[in-house]
Amino acid sequence: MSAFGIRQLDHVNLRTVNLDAMTEFYTEVIGLRSGPRPAFPFPGAWLYCGDTPVLHLVGVEQALHPREPQIEHFAFSATGLDDFTRRLQRHGLDYRRSKVPGTSLTQVHLRDCDGNHLHVDFEGQS
């Protein structure tokens, strides 16, 4: 029996009233791909990075309105900073680039169709 230890974040699950638009955003803009999903009794999509389903979208009829968001952001690591920013520009999306002090990490901050904050991180690229 081995000792317990977290290896990595497995996936993020987002509820959305805009299932088609969110699926398109995360495939066309972010570069994930749609893939197999179990036959749950509710609408949704699983979006993959390589062979791993990293984003689960669940279609809902009505948005929840919490007083304050419970998740401030989530992030992806990536390569091809210039390619990515050109992709955002082609899609007419607002974004903000920032450097993490004391590191070689560049972050590109943006919001998806539902207003969720995410950033895409590029190590050693500026």
Feature-to-residue mapping (PLM):
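Exposed loop/turn and edge beta-strand positions of beta-sandwich/beta-sheet ligand-binding modules
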Residues: 8, 41, 70, 104
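Helix N-cap motif at beta-to-alpha junctions
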Residues: 18-19, 79-81
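Vicinal oxygen chelate
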Residues: 1-5, 85, 90-126
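Residue-level structural signal for beta-strand termini and adjacent loop
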Residues: 59-60, 123
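Core segments of cupin and vicinal oxygen chelate
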Residues: 13-54
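N-terminal beta-strand motif that seeds the catalytic metal site of vicinal oxygen chelate
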Residues: 1-20, 51, 71-74, 126
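Short, charged/polar surface micro-motifs in flexible loops or helix N-caps
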Residues: 51-55, 61-64, 81-83
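A short, compositionally biased micro-patch
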Residues: 40, 50, 81, 101-103, ...
